[in-house]
């Protein structure tokens, strides 16, 4: 229970930010899932991978996820994409 007006405002602001962060994190996860689904289906789509990487970068810049977390997830996605494109003749 907040004892001061500023503490009450902090609670409201934290709730808003948590919701915003949750929405952004969800967008990132969805983009990664779409890209991976395309890769595993045998139709690797560079545009989906690029979008997922862009969202990861933006989330890291905004402080929603740690920069190393974004780098690791981008690396793994790029590795899967490279493996799929090398395996499938275009």
Curated annotation (Swiss-Prot):
GO cellular component: cytosol; small ribosomal subunit
Database matches in InterPro entries: Ribosomal_bS20, Ribosomal_bS20_sf
UniProt keyword annotation of RNA-binding present: yes
GO MF: small ribosomal subunit rRNA binding; structural constituent of ribosome
GO biological process per UniProt: translation
Hydrolase among keywords: no
Keywords: Ribonucleoprotein, Ribosomal protein, RNA-binding, rRNA-binding
Family: Belongs to the bacterial ribosomal protein bS20 family.
Role, per record: Binds directly to 16S ribosomal RNA.
Record-linked PANTHER family: 30S RIBOSOMAL PROTEIN S20, SMALL RIBOSOMAL SUBUNIT PROTEIN BS20C
UniProt protein name: Small ribosomal subunit protein bS20
Source species: Roseiflexus sp. (strain RS-1)
